[in-house]
Structures are given as structure tokens and as C-alpha cells.
Amino acid sequence: MATAVFKNITPIPDVNTFLDVVLSRTQRKTPTVIRSGFKISRIRGFYGRKVKFTQDTITEKLDSILQEFPKLNDIHPFHADLLNILYDRDHLKIALSQLSTAKHLVENVARDYIRLLKYGDSLYRCKQLKRAALGRMATIIKRQKSSLEFLEQVRQHLSRLPAIDPNTRTLLVCGYPNVGKSSFMNKVTRAQVDVQPYAFTTKSLFVGHFDYKYLRWQVIDTPGILDHPLEQMNTIEMQSITAMAHLRSAVLYFMDLSEMCGYSVAAQVKLYHSIKPLFANKVTILVLNKIDAMRPEDLDQKNQELLQTIIDDGNVKVVQTSCVQDIGVMDVRTTACEALLAARVEQKLKGSRVNNVLNRIHLAEPAARDEVARPACIPDSVKTRRAYDANDPNRRILARDIEAANGGAGVYNVELRDKYILQDPSWKYDRMPELLDGKNVADFVDPEIEAKLLALDEEEERLEREGYYDSDQEIEDADEEEVLEKASRIREKNKLTMLAARQKKIKNRPVLPRTAGIRTLDELQSSLQSAGLPSDSIEERARSRARTAAANEMADGSGVDLLMNEGEEIRSKSIAPRSQSNRRESGVHAEGARSYADRLARVKQIHRNRMARASESDRHVIAAKPKHLLSGKRGNGKTQRR
């Protein structure tokens, strides 16, 4: 359907947005780094790629606009004329042709500058050529400002047009303004057309839908038409003329005999005869509306004669209605639908396609064996059966009556098993067997299992009362008692050791090396004595190791060396340690110079701390542009690192 295509047109951007989209896409989708030291062929290819990519993007955008807009020569004549009335066919074609011309100009500019880039001898000249090419393309697009704005307005209006199918079953409502066309449409369809007591409330085509005989129908409410030449009709009236001229439908011509619409009966009859050529080969229904105010029988002689000129036409059917009091509204709809269905069937029978179908249809009729008539036989019981009456006490009781008597829906549970047809009626209410792996579960269920379980529970309680499960074994061996006592003391000691270790760890102290915690011989002896262990052998072993170390030192040197070493040792012990001056105070003599020096040191450390330097000698240069953050480009499905 063309109207569905109208609603799918992509929004058209203005000039500035168009250029922003194109240039930003070029910047994102093409390389951005080039150096003057690269090969000239690489530089030419770099800028040539940018020019070509920009031209491709502009061409793609303009092509999508040109392809999405409907071609007036290819769509239905109704939609083509409607677009001509609403937007002017020539204006629309000129706007589209200007975009097509701009597309070709952009292609020519890109072709010329790519040829010039092949002769660029430096990065600067190639860059200037690229800049000139993109500038000329942007200038060409900027000149299409008015065309893009006009096409965007047309697109917005097209998307709001009603979805009119020119090939489906259609009822077309027409007539003078304010004769009740929109009121009738609101009655027979789900549309909500604005109805006001003044003329030209409806200024465009409105569509409503309804179902009749399981078929989908559409009703088109047209704006009011005035009786004047076609050249003098405005856009609102021309929409109605276009619909009547091109849509194959049933035309409902509404007349207001009460003249409350502001137009006389004679004017309405004259308008009918003026637009009668548009009703050729169409089903025409004359709808006399507002009969609650004026009926045809109450008209004067002159108006009745004028009305009769329309009725005398053999192709016109007359229906009376009143939308205010809902008189004859459905009759109008039924009459129009039946007439249109018959006309469509008749038209299809006149076509050539029906012969292809009729040749394959054969109606089989039984051959008469004699002259005896054998009509359909209807039993007397069926003929005498009375119609069901809910108020009849002797009526047949239905399932609905049983449900209502037992609480209604949601309360009463319908018993469906009483309708089962089985060999034995007693089987109706048997429970359905539960099958598992092709076997009936009921066959494997012990009916006495609950009684057996109860007997087992009673026996268990009896054994517990008698002390059957109580243990008679007691520990009477003294050795076993001693072992158990030692084991309990060991477990208690391990627990205390673990707690002490935990308390030691939670103290906020630095962890010292193993050598810093060396204990003396006296501490070792005291700990062994407290544990009840001998310590004499430990002391003797320590003294022997000390004597062995001293003898080794004497064996390494001569006696003179030993005497010298002993003299040096005595002399070193007699010399007092040399006093050391505070290095922070050296070189600072004046009062207040210390605080100034500290303040100056802090100032000098600011830069080092900000640059995350370890010290003054830290000269490490970190990466100015981390490659894992700045390398790669996401585009065309290619990804490097990121």
C-alpha cells in the first residue's frame, strides 16, 4: 500500500545537520594520522581516501532520499493526483531533481580532485586539495537548503495522511458541507471525526473501518463540495473530487432536506447533477439525512419534483436516515455494502480471469430415475418443537441452567464424566490410572504399607524403653584413663598456643627477622628447667663450641698478630666514641634559617611528588600517549587491541 510506504520515509535533515553527519562520519571512518616524512604515495592515498569517502557518504544520503520518495508515475493514480493537489507535482519533482543534480555535481568534484591529488608533491598541497574538495562539496549541499526543507515538510505531511487502500471495498461519503457526512461515519465505524454545527469542519480525507459479512470495509469521509466550476475549487474540495474520480467504491451522496445545512434542496440537486459524471460505473446511493426534521413526503411540490429527477435515474437507490436518532443508519450501511458486493462480483464475472476458474468448476447433479418428486424430509417432531424460552417452566434443562442453579461460573464444576459412553456405566467415575514407564503405579503400591510402618514405629519405641540401644561397655583400664588425660592436656596446650599466637599477630608491631629474636643460653636453660628437662649437656656443648671457635682463630694467625690484636682490642676499648654532629644543622647558623630551609625543601618536593618521582635521581620518562588507550580504530568490523 502506498500510504504505508509514505510512513516509512526516513526524516530528512537540514543542511547543517546533513554536513555534520557527513563530515563527522568521514573523520570517524578514515585514518587521522599522517606525517610529512611518509612516502608521497601514502600521503596522496590518505587524502584521496578522505575525498572519496566523503563523496560516497553524500551520494548514499541523497540516494536514500530519492529512492524513498514515491515516484508519481509508478503509484496509483489516486495517490498521484492527491500528491499533486496537496504539494504540486511540479514543485515536488523540481526539488527531487535538484537533489539528483547535486549528487552528480558532488561525484564530478570528487573525480576531479582525486585526479589532481595524484600530482600532489607534498603533504601541504595534498591537504589543501582535500580541503578544497570538501569545501566545494559542502557548498553544493548548502545550495540545496530550500529543497531539503520542502521535502522534509512533505515527508511530515505524508506520514500523517490516512491509510487509504484504493483497491479494497470502499464507501465514499460526499455532499454539501454540514449535511451529516461525518456523523454517519462516526456511527458506522470506530473513527472519531470532529463534528461541528458549521460548514467545512472536515478539511481533509478521513478513513474509518468496519466489518460486514466477515469482510473488511473502509469508509472515506470527504470534505464538503460547493457547486462551482472545477477551476475555482480549492485544495479541500479537490481532495473530494480526486477520491470520487479514482476510487472504485459505492458513492453515498448525502442530502439535507431540512435545509439546516444552509443550502437549499435545489442547490443540492444541482450539485448532484454537476458531479454525476464522476459516478459513472459506480454504485450510487442517495441518502436523505435528517428525516427527523424533514421527510420527503413533507416537501413542497417543487422540491419533490427536483428530488424525483435524481430518483428517476435507474442506478440510484434511495435510503432515508437520521444520525441523531439512529434511524436507518444500519440500513444505509447494509444497502451500500450489498450493492457494492454485487457490483464487484458482476465486474469480476465480466473479466477474462473468471473463465479460467469456471472451466475447472463442475456442478454434479444426480440424474432423475423417475418422475416422483423427493423433497427434503423434515420429521414432525422437529416441526412441532417449540423454541427455547428461559421463562417457560416446562423448558428443556440446559447445562447453563444447572450451572446457574449451583452457584454460577467459577463456583460450579461441570461434571463431564456423566456423558461417557462405556460398556459398564459404573466405570464412568473410576479414577484414571497413573502410568510411569508404561506401568500402572497402583500395581506397585502395598495397600498395607501404612499399617506396617505403624508397627515398626511401635517396635522401635519399645526397644528404646527397654534400653536395647544403651551401651554396656565402660572404661575400667587405668592406662587408658591416663592416655585420655594426657591427650586432653595436649589439646588444651595446643589451644593456648594457638590463642597466644593470635594475640601476638594482632599487635601492631613490625615483623622482626629470625636473628633479631635470638635467645641467650641462660634463657634456654631456664626454659628447659621449667619444663623438667636436664640442661647440663646443653651448657657443656655450648662451651665446647665456643672453645673450638677461639682455637680456630689462634691457629689462623701468628703469635705477633695475636699480641697486636689483643693490643688493638684493649686500645679500642679505652678510646671513647667520636661525637657526630647533626647533619641537619650543618651550614645553618642564623636564627630562623632552619625553618626556612625546611620550608624550601618542602617546596622543592612538590614537583617531584606531583610527577610521582622516587627521588631527585629519578629521570624515568613515562609514555606520553599509552598505546593501549590510543591505538586502533573501531570501524568496518576491525578492532585493534580495544
Swiss-Prot record:
Superkingdom per UniProt: Eukaryota
Keyword rRNA processing: no
Gene3D superfamilies: 1.20.120.1190, P-loop containing nucleotide triphosphate hydrolases
Encoding gene, per UniProt annotation: nog1
Protein location: Nucleus, Nucleolus
Residue ranges with Basic and acidic residues bias: 582-601
CDD domains found in the cross-reference section: NOG
PTM-bearing positions, type Phosphotyrosine: Y468
Modified residues (Phosphoserine): S471
Chain segments carrying region Disordered: 571-642
GO biological process, one term: ribosomal subunit export from nucleus
Similarity comment: Belongs to the TRAFAC class OBG-HflX-like GTPase superfamily. OBG GTPase family. NOG subfamily.
Keyword list, A-Z: GTP-binding, Nucleotide-binding, Nucleus, Phosphoprotein, Ribosome biogenesis
SUPFAM superfamilies assigned to the protein according to its UniProt record, in alphabetical order: P-loop containing nucleoside triphosphate hydrolases
Binding site for GTP: 175-182, 221-225, 289-292
Biased composition (Basic residues): 602-611, 625-642
Presence of keyword Nucleus: yes
Function: Involved in the biogenesis of the 60S ribosomal subunit.
Domain OBG-type G: 169-341
Gene Ontology MF terms in the entry: GTP binding; GTPase activity; RNA binding
A GO CC term assigned to this protein in UniProt: nucleolus
Designated name of the protein: Probable nucleolar GTP-binding protein 1
Major subcellular location class: nucleus
Pfam families: NOG1, NOG1_N, NOGCT
